[in-house]
């Protein structure tokens, strides 16, 4: 009898958490955390509590390079590190985690099915809108109430509702500026890191 022809082994799906990929995630978490400490005050309309940082660029890049699940985990780890020195009972860090997740999930999921720069550009634009809308909700129902609690029930002498009414435009513009800035930096770094990752075979 002749030996049966060996059937080709189908392509195996990539393992999600190999040592190499975990190391890659750890590096991006460290970079994101370190850069997030370099905050730039952006007191729009007198909102002195608004501070801009670009740490999430590395989280968004990770979402395209490895996938949305890895990016959300990395974001959670980064915000957990920031919680250690938080002065807001981790409310700001929790809000940032929610906002960042809202920003990156749609772009990174769609990118799985269509990997090109056009997909990145269009979906990041949508992500900016989603992040800004989520930020308004997070500030109204999470950050402002927590800060009011920390400062004896008021923010700058105002109730939560009054403070949000006074600062919502500043919050909207701030988060729009932040998400657009992160999108631009992501687009500038995306191609180089994508090629680098291919060489690493992660």
Where are each of the predicted segments found?
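Loop-helix junctions at membrane interfaces
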Residues: 1-202
